[in-house]
Regions:
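Alpha-helical DNA-contacting segments of helix-turn-helix folds
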Residues: 20, 52-62, 101, 105, ...
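Amphipathic alpha-helical linker/stalk segments
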Residues: 56-83, 119-131
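C-terminal peripheral helix-coil segments that are non-catalytic and often amphipathic
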Residues: 126-130, 163-215
Length: 215
């Protein structure tokens, strides 16, 4: 009869998650997990059977951590902006979990950055339509394009190549947000992709540079 494990599966997954936080998913082995638990590797294989199963459980746990961030964003006064800033916060505070979920092929979880975007898109769509008075198609395009920028900035943060503060990032997102919204409102067919691109740019170029007034 095999000895009873003194750790629950939940405790083991929590230890594995902590290993990933410090060493990345590549650093998660039976030995590093056992070291974190202060035990041998035998209880790990008794509970899970293989490290592949452990990695799947860690991915699911990482998703739950990520969900706490996005849920906090959804509670903000402007949910779609809150979600974007929480996505960036997740990248800053949990870089290895971000790397696991969004920069690594999912470990059998069917999870990816694009799937995350589509899920969030569904959640914020009603608010976008109500606040900005736009159609479902326009709301989806608005969030998708803004999310591309959010994801790019978050990836720069995780790879250690983002020189911008949260305040500067907020300014970038505001500028992109205004640009997308203005295009949706003023360029016929923008959301559907049927607008005349050349004509749109000619109209902008024809306005010439803006002259800044002296104070």
């Amino acid at each position: 009869m095999a000895p009873k494990n003194k750790f629950t599966k939940e405790e083991m997954v929590a230890a594995a998650l902590q290993v990933v936080r410090t060493k990345g998913i590549e650093g998660l082995t039976a030995k590093t997990m056992a070291d974190a638990l202060g035990t041998s590797t035998q209880p790990i294989f008794t509970a899970f059977g293989s490290m592949d199963i452990v990695r799947q459980e860690v991915c699911a746990a990482a998703v739950r951590v990520y969900d706490r961030y996005t849920n906090a964003g959804l509670q903000e006064k402007i949910p779609f902006f809150g979600v974007g800033m929480q996505y960036i916060r997740f990248a800053r505070e949990e870089p290895e979990l971000y790397r696991l979920l969004f920069l690594t092929r999912a470990q059998g979880q069917g999870w990816s950055a694009m799937q995350s975007m589509k899920h969030l898109q569904t959640l914020v769509r009603p608010t976008l339509m109500e606040i900005y008075q736009i159609t479902e198609l326009e709301a989806d395009l608005y969030f998708r394009d803004l999310w591309f920028v959010v994801h790019s900035l978050s990836t720069l943060i995780v790879t250690g190549d983002c020189p911008y503060s949260d305040q500067e990032i907020g300014q970038v997102l505001t500028g992109v947000s205004i640009s997308i919204y203005k295009s949706i409102k003023e360029i016929t067919g923008f959301a559907a992709g049927t607008f005349d691109r050349d004509a749109a740019f000619r109209a902008l170029v024809g306005k010439g540079p803006r002259v800044q007034e002296d104070d």
